[in-house]
């Protein structure tokens, strides 16, 4: 549907983010630099996720100054506390049990950076997700599938984890890990892509 008019790099190894860009028909390369992903003392979830997206993008953009770099970070927040990727299966079960029967917020920040053009921006998108009530047995059965172990909040809305979701308010693609409508709008604005 879209074509790239400028060199584009995705600074993420996420298969879900890659799939979204593939669905748009974009040509891009993938470059990833690891960074320390720890919240600063007193840093809000919003500030943390924005900083992570910018740091991931900047680390790649520095080495590819002529390219346009997209980077993103996604977190799940419950009661203003960040639920990242689970450490192990037990941590995943505990997270899911905390989310059961409640609403939480999924925040994805994406950064668009081009060193050559002196462009560096970040945008935060929030989606409310409402979980149905379920118990530890259901949480353990889901964790046993292996699906939640690499996902913020210990679930994947695009997979079996959708069984827990009663409703969402906001962007579905944001919950998966990349708010497409907002991203495409900015890439069109900078003439990085066109129809």
Swiss-Prot record:
GO terms for molecular function: dTTP diphosphatase activity; UTP diphosphatase activity. One of its GO terms (biological process) is nucleotide metabolic process. It catalyses: dTTP + H2O = dTMP + diphosphate + H(+); UTP + H2O = UMP + diphosphate + H(+). It holds the Pfam family Maf. Its EC number is 3.6.1.9. It is found in: Cytoplasm. InterPro entries: ITPase-like_fam (IPR029001), Maf-like (IPR003697). Nucleoside triphosphate pyrophosphatase that hydrolyzes dTTP and UTP. May have a dual role in cell division arrest and in preventing the incorporation of modified nucleotides into cellular nucleic acids. CDD domains: Maf. Its cofactor is a divalent metal cation. It is an enzyme of class 3 (hydrolase). Belongs to the Maf family. YhdE subfamily. SUPFAM superfamilies: ITPase-like. This is dTTP/UTP pyrophosphatase.
